[in-house]
Amino acid sequence: MLITIVAAAAMAGAMGQMPRAETVVRPLTYVSLEPVPRGRNFEVAVVAEIQPGFHINANKVLEDYLIPTTVEPDLPNGIRLTEASYPKPLLKKFEFSEQKMAVYEGSVTIRLKLSAQPDAPLGETKIPVTLRYQACNDTACLPPVRKNLPVILQIAPAGTTAQAVNPEIFKKK
């Protein structure tokens, strides 16, 4: 009987324990070219691995009160954003919402299409990127999170041969 009570208490404690919001999503960044020649287009991908049992809101939320997932680059001189591309969300119903919600689960790739301008400074270039999300499980949401992610690339003179890198991330669809 004592073992049953201890086991039940341990399970209740584990079920009620929510992880820290910062630990639910593990993001990594990838660049499509190495180096990036001046005048060339390239991509940066933010791949977010979402802990099982959790989801994050899509970029286009269906209710005004929801916090959308966003990727915001702080572009240095000579780099321009041409497009941000978010994946198609899942539509799911949860206990805490009367309506279906647009969410991401599992692994999510957000792509930024960028251009290295003809006057982009040569050498190492850092593009700070901020991932903003709110993670939830079926019954509750954690506080919103902003994660600063480093993207480091090399800008080369125009005409330099660029090598496509990270093909598993940037494969054509």
Regions found by a protein language model. Give the residues of each.
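Bacterial N-terminal signal peptides
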Residues: 1-13
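Extracellular/lumen-exposed scaffold segments
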Residues: 13-173
